[in-house]
């Protein structure tokens, strides 16, 4: 009887070299089955003791190989199900079917966006585009050729007056529909909007006042006299303190202006800012110097305030004044007043 370790080693060598499945006569023992699941551990035994266990290890290896061959050679029975290999990765989904979209989507009818008619109410003339092009082409032709074309089409050529009447009718119908569409939406509270009438538009308050002033002063507001800021404040103060005594007519007579000017002064609520007040005083000071400079040239003695500013009367005027008559002096004063206005 040969040693099992020698035969097992020879059988493994021949099988690996020739790649031939050699059946084994040995049966699988429970001990061999337990060796399949036995964990392999590294031995820390000395060298002289390791030789004692070589035969047992070779025997277990041979039994393991024989059990694998037996499992591979035996066909699966009807009751036993073949083992499915375990998947190392997740199952991949099947590739999408490109035909499912075509199957599920409903078939849309073939149409063209230009084939749709315009919305009702937007355009009165619903004639097709080809007929419109044909009409435009026919308009450039001579009258005889147009009559022949209309006769071939079985229609009568419209006259120029009839064409203009149709055009005006279409424009009026368009305007009417647009007004009805604007008034049908309705405003707040469900009330329809009022139609816009261009002949009678809504006017603001200042427009009414402007028209009233135009009727009252056709040539515009031209005051004969300008009052200083101090005079304006004095008019307001007098009328506020003594309204019964200093009425509009009395103030107009006192300051030699029209009653309308007094009414405007009392009605106005505008007050200048500090910067505007400074500019206003400077402007009136320059105006006063210019006026009294003219008076001084005519021989009128200016007040002390303006004499301190360097305005002195003309000395030659007095010498010439002796020779002039009263009438000449009166004419000179009238001319002076007219130039100052």
Swiss-Prot record:
A GO cellular component entry from the record: nucleus
Keyword Mitochondrion: yes
Transit peptide per record: 1-60
UniProt similarity note: Belongs to the RRG9 family.
Biased composition regions of type Gly residues, renumbered to the chain: 181-190
Function: Required for respiratory activity and maintenance and expression of the mitochondrial genome.
Annotated protein name in UniProt: Required for respiratory growth protein 9, mitochondrial
Biased composition (Basic and acidic residues): 112-129, 149-172, 201-217
The entry's keywords: Mitochondrion, Transit peptide
């Amino acid at each position: 009887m040969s040693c099992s370790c020698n035969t097992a080693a020879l059988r493994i060598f021949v099988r690996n070299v020739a790649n031939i499945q050699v059946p084994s006569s040995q049966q699988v023992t429970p001990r061999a089955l337990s060796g399949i699941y036995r964990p392999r551990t590294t031995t820390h035994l000395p060298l002289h003791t390791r030789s004692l266990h070589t035969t047992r290890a070779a025997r277990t290896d041979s039994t393991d190989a024989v059990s694998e061959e037996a499992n591979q050679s035996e066909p699966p029975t009807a009751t036993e199900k073949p083992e499915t290999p375990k998947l190392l990765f997740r199952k991949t989904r099947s590739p999408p079917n490109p035909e499912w979209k075509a199957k599920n989507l409903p078939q849309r009818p073939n149409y063209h966006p230009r084939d749709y008619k315009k919305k009702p109410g937007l355009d009165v003339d619903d004639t097709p585009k080809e007929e419109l092009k044909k009409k435009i082409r026919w308009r450039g032709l001579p009258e005889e050729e147009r009559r022949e074309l209309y006769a071939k089409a079985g229609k009568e050529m419209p006259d120029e007056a009839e064409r203009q009447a149709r055009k005006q009718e279409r424009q009026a119908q368009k305007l009417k529909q647009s007004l009805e569409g604007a008034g049908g939406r309705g405003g707040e509270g469900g009330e329809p909007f009022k139609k816009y009438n261009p002949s009678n538009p809504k006017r603001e308050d200042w427009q009414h006042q402007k028209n009233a002033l135009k009727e009252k002063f056709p040539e515009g507001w031209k005051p004969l006299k300008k009052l200083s800021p101090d005079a304006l404040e004095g008019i307001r103060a007098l009328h506020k303190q003594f309204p019964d005594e200093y009425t509009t007519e009395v103030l107009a007579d006192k300051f030699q202006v029209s009653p309308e000017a007094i009414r405007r002064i009392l009605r106005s609520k505008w007050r200048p800012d500090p910067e505007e007040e400074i500019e206003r005083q400077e402007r009136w000071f320059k105006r006063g110097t210019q006026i009294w400079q003219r008076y001084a040239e005519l021989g009128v003695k200016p007040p002390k305030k303006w004499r301190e500013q360097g305005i002195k009367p003309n000395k030659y005027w007095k010498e010439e004044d002796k020779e002039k008559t009263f009438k000449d002096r009166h004419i000179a004063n009238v001319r002076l007043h007219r130039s100052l206005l």
